[in-house]
Amino acid sequence: MDNTSFEKREFISVWVRDPQVHKEDFWHTYISYEICLHTNSMCFRKKTSCVRRRYSEFVWLRHKLQDNALLIELPKLPPWNPFFNLNNEFHITQRMQGLQQFLEAVLQTPLLLSDSRLHLFLQSQLSIAKMDACAQGHTHYTVAQAIQRCGGEARFPVEEQHQEDSKTCCDSDCDSTTSSGLGCSIEPATLVEQDLSHNERFAHEFQATNPEAELCSSLSSSPHGHSVI
């Protein structure tokens, strides 16, 4: 088998989808996006993964990638919009598409695939501070351990297409304010809080039986920031 044949068979597929609203308090609300990765590339430790990230984390990633690859012109992110509206379907879809295009371009740049922060961003649940610390070797766990500990059931569009095709028109009868109307659900704050509570309970039980408490705590904590981005 020649190198050309091998390169044709290697692939890295990424999807940015399923925007969900997270309400931190009365004033602070943001949207997170699900990032699904499917690959057979030897560059990645896990061949399938799903994590959730917010816009500000994409900004951090681009900044770190640029610092480590000064001679490369990185793809641009969708611009920050001071008038971004959480209830505006067009704003959400436009940003989501821009984030996916950014990741697709990054993953097509071989030099960037060696950056450990990119792998932590795509395949771990660590916060920005924890990703930075882990990449610099300042944690008790390695990059590989952080990635392997990431749970998250992967859900890919190509695998769900059959289910989508089998749905009846009753889907349209179920539309409500919890849906963007574009196939990307906007999760109410109450459901998000339930998910977070579930994660906290899981982390507590895991810590009680696993000595790697620091890593588990990092994986179970979701990043928090300011305002609506």
UniProtKB/Swiss-Prot annotation:
Single GO term (MF): phosphatidylinositol phosphate binding
Keywords: Cilium biogenesis/degradation, Cytoplasm, Cytoskeleton, Endosome, Lipid-binding, Membrane, Protein transport, Transport
Pfam family name, one: PX
SUPFAM superfamilies hit by this protein: PX domain (SSF64268)
Main localization (coarse): cytoplasm
GO annotation, cellular component aspect: centrosome; endosome; endosome membrane
GO annotation, biological process: cilium assembly; heart looping; intracellular protein transport; Kupffer's vesicle development; left/right axis specification; protein localization to centrosome; protein localization to cilium; vesicle organization
Location relative to the cell: Cytoplasm; Endosome membrane; Cytoplasm, Cytoskeleton, Microtubule organizing center, Centrosome
Ligand binding (a 1,2-diacyl-sn-glycero-3-phospho-(1D-myo-inositol-3-phosphate)): 54, 95
Free-text function comment from the UniProt entry: Probable phosphoinositide-binding protein involved in protein sorting and membrane trafficking in endosomes. May play a role in cilium biogenesis through regulation of the transport and the localization of proteins to the cilium.
Family to which the UniProt record says this protein belongs: Belongs to the sorting nexin family.
Name the UniProt record assigns to this protein: Sorting nexin-10A
UniProt organism field: Danio rerio (Zebrafish)
